[in-house]
């Protein structure tokens, strides 16, 4: 299918992907913008996975203070080169992540960071809730796994749904940026401060 330059430009403006990637995604999606965005997102996740092992020795320490001056965030966002660290897009990403941390108060960066004793305690609580249920053991185990998944999505930054997004997780947003800049990007550390907490 031959796609118009206008559609390619619109897709590029909304995703930040390269012109050729936009053209190919639109052709694959038969001109459907929404399908093309989904294709680009999947390819972005693939690109991000390929770059995940690369070292991020550059980056920025980003600070955010909420307008009421009662919540603040310090974020260490890593990348591979100082060129990317200086871009407006990288700073915008740091701001988005900091807003997420300020509003959703995650406890850990990823599920791998959650201490095993906390996971065990959560499982114990969930199993106790199901103790008197007549459900088979395999169903109980599935319920516990689902509840753990919800626990991770509430408490792990990368798994949280972006507060200003449409079903995207923080990991999805980072993966899109990785695909755009061609470098690995990592959330290395964060700290959230709040008056009265």
UniProtKB/Swiss-Prot annotation:
Associates with the EF-Tu.GDP complex and induces the exchange of GDP to GTP. It remains bound to the aminoacyl-tRNA.EF-Tu.GTP complex up to the GTP hydrolysis stage on the ribosome. It is found in: Cytoplasm. Pfam families: EF_TS (PF00889). NCBIfam families: tsf (TIGR00116). PROSITE patterns: EF_TS_1, EF_TS_2. Gene3D superfamilies: 1.10.286.20, DNA helicase RuvA subunit, C-terminal domain, Elongation factor Ts, dimerisation domain. The keyword Cytoplasm applies. GO terms for cellular component: cytoplasm. This is Elongation factor Ts. It comes from the Bacteria. Belongs to the EF-Ts family. Keywords: Cytoplasm, Elongation factor, Protein biosynthesis. It comes from Petrotoga mobilis (strain DSM 10674 / SJ95). The keyword Protein biosynthesis applies. GO terms for molecular function: translation elongation factor activity. Residues 81-84 are annotated as: Involved in Mg(2+) ion dislocation from EF-Tu. Transmembrane segments: none annotated.
């Amino acid at each position: 299918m031959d796609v118009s330059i206008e559609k390619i430009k619109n897709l590029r403006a909304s995703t930040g992907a390269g012109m050729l990637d936009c053209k190919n995604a639109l052709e694959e999606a038969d001109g459907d913008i929404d399908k093309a965005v989904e294709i680009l997102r999947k390819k972005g996740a693939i690109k991000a996975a390929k770059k995940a092992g690369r070292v991020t020795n550059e980056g920025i320490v980003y600070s955010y203070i909420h307008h009421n001056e009662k919540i603040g965030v310090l974020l260490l966002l890593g990348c591979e080169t100082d060129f990317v660290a200086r871009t407006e897009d990288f700073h915008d990403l740091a701001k988005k992540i900091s807003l997420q941390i300020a509003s959703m108060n995650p406890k850990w960066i990823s599920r791998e960071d959650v201490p095993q004793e906390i996971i065990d305690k959560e499982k114990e609580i969930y199993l106790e809730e199901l103790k008197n249920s007549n459900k088979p053991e395999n169903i109980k185990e599935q319920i516990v796994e689902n509840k753990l998944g919800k626990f991770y999505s509430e408490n792990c930054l990368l798994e949280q749904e972006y507060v200003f997004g449409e079903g995207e997780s923080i990991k999805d947003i980072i993966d899109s940026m990785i695909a755009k800049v061609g470098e690995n990007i990592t959330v290395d550390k964060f700290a959230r401060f709040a008056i009265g907490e």
